[in-house]
Amino acid sequence: MSNPSRRDFLKSTVSKAFSAGLGVCAGAELFATSTASSAVLATPPPSPSPIKKGLVFDMLPSKLSYVERMKLARDVGFEVLQAPTTPDEHAAEEMKKAADAANIRIDSVMNMDHWKYPLSSSDAAVVEKSLAGMRTSLHNAKLWGSDAVLLVPAVVNPQTSYRDAWSRSQTQIRKLLPLAEELKIVIAIEEVWNKFLLSPLEMAKYIGEFQSPWIQAWFDVGNVVLYGYPQDWIRTLGKGIAKVHLKDFKRKKDGFAWVNLGDGDVDWEAVRQAFRETGYSGSAICELDGGDEVYLRDVSRRVDRLVLGQS
């Protein structure tokens, strides 16, 4: 697979303490009690999280140049970026140069045509436009050194049934597999509010039917809060998750709101634990409102605390 290798978190083991003055356990410090007749072992600090912290390119101030935006992302603590599909070849080259200059990786591509031109459409012309957009996204990914392209696979609506969305989209995605394999780019299926793949079991089944390492999941933490639990999705999809989007969601009496990380209903401690259990070591990319340096630095610190478990 082209996505980064999974690294297991370090598991620390603690042996029973010896009597006062008798030896210490490896990896822990032995402290004598006030009676000097027993000892207590200090718990080693958790190992650093292997998850890479990122954000979508559109969160950065548009008034800045490509290089300035990417340097800002790096300066406030982000390691990777997700960039949008860029059909203009010159602009795509400039994005690459800017990322190199800023020493930040364009980790993945946000495909831009799947909502306007869904692969599940019954209109062949619409589907071809969608396929063309994905091909551009895959080539962008290769140019930028990315390893995944996000894809919304289908849209269920009055014209497209759930069954048709399933079969049509799989048929079209299979047409993209040879290119994805050639370029070694994962097509990462995201769960969104498209009335499709409404449970982690369905999503796992849908992806599993491709029987290809080049089709994996892009899991969005905030998107499932209305009807599910992110930690459940993470455990169910497990090693099939290639990338992650970070959002937070808050229920309100008069509806709902997308809010900053930690200000909504996501149980971040449970999410963090689920990532640990599954050994997730990919990217966690913020998909939030944009803002200035002060705001972005605050978002970066929230990721440190809520997702990476750093104080």
List PLM regions with ranges.
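Glycine-rich, proline-tolerant flexible connector loops at the mouths of alpha/beta enzymes
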Residues: 83-99, 153-160
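Active-site-proximal loop/turn and secondary-structure-junction residues that shape catalytic pockets
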Residues: 59-61, 87, 112-115, 155-157, ...
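Short amphipathic alpha-helices and their capping/turn segments at secondary-structure boundaries
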Residues: 90-103, 133-143, 229-239, 273
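Active-site acidic/histidine proton-transfer and metal-coordination neighborhood
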Residues: 13-23, 27, 120-219, 226, ...
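Histidine-acidic metal/acid-base catalytic patches
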Residues: 2-34, 38-54, 59, 63-74, ...
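N-terminal small/glycine-rich loop or linker at the start of catalytic domains
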Residues: 44-56, 108-119, 156
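A structural motif
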Residues: 78, 141, 146, 241, ...
